[in-house]
Each structure stands twice: as structure tokens, then as C-alpha cells.
Amino acid sequence: AHATSSHGLAHAAASVRIGVAKSTKPDTAEATEAALRQLASKLGGATPDVVLVVLCGANPQEPSPYDLEACLARLRVGEHALAASTKVVATTSCMGIAVESQWVGGNAIALMGICDPEGSYEVCYADASQGSEAVRERVAAAAARSGREEPPAVSIVFTQGHETTSLRGIQAALGEEAHLVGGCIFLANPPGLAVSPGGGGRDESATSGLVMLLCWPNATVAS
């Protein structure tokens, strides 16, 4: 049996910081920098272990003003640049985005940063057009990198096509009871998905497939 004191749980929860930020500036570099500045303030200057990025265009009938790869590059430079070790998972979207219980319609770049040095977080991209086995291999490899024996407490998934194939591959890697949250972003114009594993790993970006953020947080997660 294993028991954890309420003080221990409180300490674990206190060591985890989550912050969200946004910018509606129409220029990719300016919006990214503004969102980074806001995120740094929300996190009290702490270095996030992982950052989730959403580039939102206003109307799916018109191209978004934001460039995904330019945003990824901008995240790593400047006064509020992410650390080289920070992992990033990014996607494009459209119409609007919810940030801190507020609906932001139209163009926006939004960030969510998690500071949890005692937790484990991994990101991965998979080309779902190659079949569910290709997805399984990528997701299983990401899970193995964490060094955790148990499945992730929760995983965030964004897909661009091949949703059924993606889910089959994920479940084959993590089990059918895996806790998943996310969705399909097929209306994004242009479509885009990307991961930046940090630590010198190779960035990957594509217009289809799936990206995942696998989370083993240092806090209790209710199922």
C-alpha cells in the first residue's frame, strides 16, 4: 500500500505551474514575442518544460496571417525565448480560441506553458497516412523516452486527417483506456502541425498527420 500525506500532495501541486497567454497582433514575430512576454509573466519567470502553441486564423476561407515555422523559430530567440530544453507541440486552427475562459475570435497566437520539473512530458509527430502501425511506433517511442512504466495520465492530440487511423495507433501504443483530449483541425488555412522536442532534437512539421503531448504530471489527475 502507498499513502501520501495531504502536505505531500499540496507540495507536489504547488511545484506545478501552468500559464496561458495570447496575442492578436497580425504579424507572426510580433504576436509570438508578445505571447512569450505574457507567458513569462504568468509563470513568474520560471522556465516551462513544455509549451503548447495554437496559431489561429480568423476565416477558414482566407489564409491565416501566421506562419507556423516562423513562429517555432521565434519561440527560441529574444528576451523571453524558450529554453533549449523546452518541448513544443504546435498546431494551426481557425475561427477563434478560448484562453482563460474567454473566447478570442479571429486571428490570435495562444500559448500554454507547463512548469513541472518533477513530471515527464514528451511530444511526437506521426504521419498517419502511413497507417496505424506507423502511428503506434512513433507514440510508443515517445512514451519510452519518458522512462515511465505507467501510461501517461493524459495526452493531448491534434489531427489533420486520418483520425480513425490515428486513434487506432495511439490505442495500440498506450492501451484502449488511454485518456485523450484534443480534436481535428481540418478547417485550418493553411493546415499545419509541428513538434520541437528540445534538447537538440530535430523539429518536425507537416500539413497532415497528428501531434501529441504525452503528460505524466507531478500532481494528482482525476480520471
Where are these regions (language model features)?
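Cofactor- and metal-binding active-site motifs of prokaryotic enzymes
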Residues: L9-S223
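Intrinsically disordered, low-complexity segments
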Residues: A3-T4, A13
